[in-house]
Amino acid sequence: MILSAAAATAEGQTVATLLRADSLRNAGSYAEAIEAYREVNDKKGIPGSWRLRALTGMATCNRQTGNYREALENYRTIDSEGLLDVRGKLNMSNLYLTLGLYADAVDLLEPLNATIGQDTRLINLASAYAYLGRGGDALQLLATAPTDGMSAEQKATLTANRGFIEMSLGQHEAAAASLGKAAGMLAEGAGRYIVMANLALAESGCGHADKALAHIDSCLTWQKINLGEKHPDYAISVRKRAEILLKAGRKDEAAEWFKTYFGLMRNYVCRSFAFLTDKQRQDFWFSNEPLVTECYATEAADPQLLYDVALFSKCLLLQVERNIEAEARRDTSASRLYDSIASLRREADKGSSDARQRDSLYAEADRQEQRLMAMMDGYRSFNANMRLTSADIARRLGRNETAIEFIRYGSTSARRYAALTLDGTGKVGFVPLWTEDSLRNFRLTDGRTLNEAMNSMRAADKNAIYTDTKLSSMIWSKLKPLLTKRGRIYFAPDGLLHLLAIENMTDAMNGSDVCRLSSTRELANDDKDIRGKALIMGGVSYDECEAKNQDDATAAPDRSASSILSALRLPPAANGAYAYLPATAAEADTIRSMIAKGSGIKAECIKGTQATETAFKLAAPSCSMIHLATHGFCFADTDRPEPLAFCRDSLREDDTMSRSGLVFAGANRMVQPAYSAYDDGILLAREASEMRLDRAALVVLSACQTGLGPITSEGVFGFQRGLKKAGAGAIVASLWNVDDKATKLLMTRFYHHLLGGMPMSEAFAQAKTDLRCHEVKIEVETDEDDKSHGQIRSLGRWVWPKKKVMKTVRPYSKPQYWAAFILIKK
C-alpha cells in the first residue's frame, strides 16, 4: 500500500508525538506525557498497536502520579478494545490491590492462564485473598506455586510474601522461618534489607527481642550507608526498631526511636508533599498516618513528642491543600525551580552507593528550595505550618488558657483515648482516659447505651446524652484538676468525640469557656476578619427557582448529586421532596437587618426562588460571612445509614465527599433530566471543596446533619470538610436534625452577640445559654374551678371550667434544641 504524501506526513507526525510522549514520560514530565499520548489516542484510524502504546503510556503516567483510578480506566479501555494482554491484566491487578478492590482482583486473576508472569499472578492473588480475610487460601495458593523456571529472586519474593501473610495471620514462628529463608536467598541490596526488617518484626512477635534488634540494626547500618538517612526505607526501619522496643515493654527507649522516626517522616513530608498530586498525598498519608501515630502507645514516656505528632498529623491534608505547583507555574523562574527541585529529589530518592553524590543532590535540592520559598509566600507558609511544635502553640496561649489534643490509639479491638494538655509555660501532660468500648457502652440514666442513643434520631435520646452528669464526669473529670478556674479550653477531638458535642457537657468544668478546633495548630494562625460582605440565604423555595443566573456562572453545571441521590433512592430524586422551612425566611430577614445596623458589613439576602445553587456559587467567594438556612443531609451508605457507621478509618475522600450536601431552590424539580442545562440544586461537599472561600471568616450552616460525616485522622469527611478545603474559617454545623424555630432564635442571638463585639466562641456559647433560658408566657389550666362563668358540658355532664393562669416556661431548655450545633474553628 502506497500512502499519499499527506497521509505519510500525518503518520510521521503521529509517530513523532508517540516518541515525544515516551521521552516526556521517561523524564518524569507525566502531565505533558499524558497530553501527548491522549493526542495520539484521539486520532481516528491509527493501528491498534499505536493505540495500545498510547493507552499503556497514559496508564503508566497516571500510576506514577497517583491517579490510580484514571490508570485503571485506561486499562479498562484497552480491555474493551480487545487489546489487553496478560501483562496488562497483571498491571490491572496491581491497581486493583492499590485501590483496595480486592474482590475485583480475585475475579480478574483466578481465571487468568498466565504463561508469563505466573509468579506475579500468584503473589497478587494471594495478597487479595489475605486482604479479604482468606489467609489460609493465600498460603495454600503460594504452596502450589511451580518454582521450576523461577529465578532465585522470584523464589525469594514468593517466600517473602508467604512470610508477610503468615505474619498478618499471627503465625510469627512460621513467618520468621519464611522471611529468614527469603533473606538468605537474596543478594545484598535494598530488597534484602526490606525482608530483614520484616524478619525483625516476626522475631519480635515470637518474643525474641534480642534477635529482632540484631536484625533491625543490621538493616539500619546498611541503609544508612547505602541509602542515607533521608531515604524512606531508612525511616521505616527506624520505626520498626521503635515497634520492637515497644512490644518488649521498653517504652522510654521506644519513644526515643519514635521521635527520630517522626523527625525523618516530617522532613520527608515537608520535602515531598508540595511536589505530589492530591491523590498521591491522600494515598501516602492514609497508609502512613497509623504508623506515624503508633508512638501514642508510649503514653507518658514523652508527652511532648505525642503532642507534636498530634499537631502534625491531625488534618494534615487540609494543611497542604494549597496547590504549590499551580502557584509556581504562574512565574517562569519559580516554575523552573519547582521542576529542578522535583528532579533532584527523584534522583536522590533512588538511592546510590555513592554517598557523596546522593548527599550532594539532597543539598542542592535544599538550596533551591530556600530560593523557591523566598519567591513564594504560599510555599513558605506551607513549610512553616508543617513544622509547628507544642512550643509554638504555647506561645499563643494566655495565662488562663489550656490546649487539649484528644488522641485515640491501639488496635481496633482495644482502642484507648487520652488527652494531651498544654499550658502557656509549654508544659505537656498525658492524661489516660477511657477505652472506646467503655465510652460506646456507657449506660445512660434511661438505660440505653451511648452508642444506641447516638445512633437514634429520637429527641429523648439526645436529651439523655447531654443531661447525664455521670457521662459528663467520665469525659471531663480527669482533666478538671489541670484546668484554670474560669479559663478557656481549646480542644481538638479524635474518633468518637467528633460526633459528640462534649463542649456542651461542661457544667462541672469550673466555668471554663470551651472552644472546638480541627487541630490546636490553628492557634498559631490569626482569625480572619468578619467585616466585609455577608451573604444570607433562607426561605428557600424547593419547588421552583429562577434558573436564569446559570447563564452568569463561570463553570458548567454540576449535576453529580442527581445521579447519586437517584441511585440511593433519596429525595428529591426518588419521588420525594424537601419541605419548605417557614422559619428560615424570618431568620434570614432578621440576620440581614441585624448586620445592616451599624456593623459596617454589607449584607446580601437571597431568598425564595432566587436562592439557587448557582446564585450561591457566584456570590459566596467574595464574602467574609456566609449564612445558609436550608435543608442539609449526610449519609454513610445505603446499608449503614446510622451516624456511628461514620466511625471508620479506611475511606477515600472522593467517595465520602459526595455523601453530604445542602439543598437550594428548585431542587425538587431541578434533579430531573429535563433540567440538565442547569445546576441540580444540590450542593455536595465535593462541589463546595472546589470553590474559593478564602475570604470567609465564618460560615454558618443553619441546617440538619452538617456536622456529620465519616471519621478519619483528617477529621469529619462531611460538608464541613468541603468548606475547609475551600478555605473557609470558622464553621457552625449540626450533629442531628434541628428544630426550625429554635434554630432561628439560636442564630439571631449568636449574631447579636458577635456583632456586639463578643469573641466568636463566647458569642456562640452565650447564644446557646440564651436559647436554654429563653422564656415565654403561656396560658395553663389549674385544678381550681372557675365559677365566674357558667358550667360547660363535658363527657355527658355539666361541670365547672378550670381557672386559667399565665405561666412562664422555657420551651427550649432541653438539649435536643441547643446541643446539636457546634462551632468549629478551622
Question: Predicted segments — roles?
Answer:
Residues 191-194, 198-459, 473, 487-508, ...:
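Alpha-helical solenoid repeat scaffolds used for protein-protein interaction
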Residues 372, 376-826:
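Catalytic cores of enzymes
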